[in-house]
Amino acid sequence: MTLPVNPVDNLAALIRCPSVTPAEGGALTALEKMLKLMGFSANRPVFSDDNTPDIENLYARKSGNGPHLMFAGHTDVVPPGDEKDWKHPPFAAEIEDGVMYGRGAVDMKGGIACFVAAVARHIEKHGNIKGSISFLITGDEEGPAVNGTVKLLEWAKQRGESWDASIVGEPTNPNALGDMIKIGRRGSLSGTITVHGVQGHAAYPHLAENPVRGIVTLVDSLLYPAFDEGTANFQASNLEVTTIDVGNKATNVIPNKATASFNIRFNDTWTAESLQAEIISRLERAARDNRLRQGRETPIKYELTWRERPSHVFLTHDEKLIGTLTASVEAVTGKRPELSTSGGTSDARFIKDYCPVVEFGLTGQTMHMVDERVALADLEGLTQIYERFIADFFG
């Protein structure tokens, strides 16, 4: 029996599965075959929810006596766009000059391929693992993230599963393998403000109520002053206005409605609830500011809606998990990785409620881009890091 010890072969098999979210595309099946070669038992639960596609997931475990390590990630990928723009077909896993091209090469089929190879090498060298390893893999990370990791964790917990630590194989390194381990993430909160006015002719503003004046005032209150100056482990919270819309194609008509959407990435100064309260307080004060609405005595009429559920800020403090991974990275790459909380959200935000979690994978420079690609040397390097981590984690 040949174990899946080669990360290049593993990744090629996964890339050739067109698992554009929410499609499974054969990727979970390919992964399950690799894991069963190593004696893993596997389940493929499908989860559903209103107004979202059904999603197939995979939970596989190889049990032993000792701590339980979870590797988590996703096999779904973003669409490739126009395939004619690619140097190599996005689902062909072609190699040129020591580089493999394909959608998901770094985000994050590459990380999965390397961890599979690392486990296989450990088993080949040492036999059984001194503990348990599980793979918690979803097909719903690039999509709404409703029927994926969050439900798979609860499904596993209800069946008696518990974990001592988790690694998420997202591409954490900005420039080169070994740059960065993510030990936490900022929270994320999104909302939409709607201001209602009265439509009218631009030449007769006294007969109308321009909602643009109101939306500008409200948005300004969220942009200044700054929410905070950052903390010891997190950069300053940052709010970005992502859309301002009036739906008006005529230049001589005052619109009857204006909307603005925003997203804020926040640090551990705030909880989602305290941040929502701060935003509401700012908007309420600004609604009474009529400097841009001369002659108007009534407050700005607006509605605030929160979009999707917020993700909460977290920071992992587990010394064994972080220390062992840091030492493994340094041993293979020769450099000490930065411990960071930068970047966007990931499914680690769900895992943190079940066990300590960190993120470490490949270099993310080409994720979601045309010609997404990974150096074969990085696949081997990451596999060696994971293999060393597994050996040291289980002692």
From Swiss-Prot:
UniProt keyword list: Amino-acid biosynthesis, Cobalt, Diaminopimelate biosynthesis, Hydrolase, Lysine biosynthesis, Metal-binding, Zinc
Cofactor annotation:
Zn(2+); Co(2+)
Where, by residue number, does the polypeptide cross the bilayer? none
The catalytic site is made up of D76, E141 (proton acceptor)
**Would I find Metal-binding among this entry's keywords?**
yes
Pathway entry: Amino-acid biosynthesis; L-lysine biosynthesis via DAP pathway; LL-2,6-diaminopimelate from (S)-tetrahydrodipicolinate (succinylase route): step 3/3
Task: Please give the SUPFAM superfamilies that the UniProt record associates with this protein.
Answer: Bacterial exopeptidase dimerisation domain (SSF55031), Zn-dependent exopeptidases (SSF53187)
A Pfam family that the UniProt record links to this protein: Peptidase_M20
Q: How is the cofactor bound?
A: Binds 2 Zn(2+) or Co(2+) ions per subunit.
A molecular-function term among this protein's GO annotations: acetylornithine deacetylase activity
Catalyses: N-succinyl-(2S,6S)-2,6-diaminopimelate + H2O = (2S,6S)-2,6-diaminopimelate + succinate
Could you describe the subunit structure of this protein? Homodimer.
Family per record: Belongs to the peptidase M20A family. DapE subfamily.
Described by its record, this protein's role is as follows: Catalyzes the hydrolysis of N-succinyl-L,L-diaminopimelic acid (SDAP), forming succinate and LL-2,6-diaminopimelate (DAP), an intermediate involved in the bacterial biosynthesis of lysine and meso-diaminopimelic acid, an essential component of bacterial cell walls.
Q: What is this protein called?
A: Succinyl-diaminopimelate desuccinylase
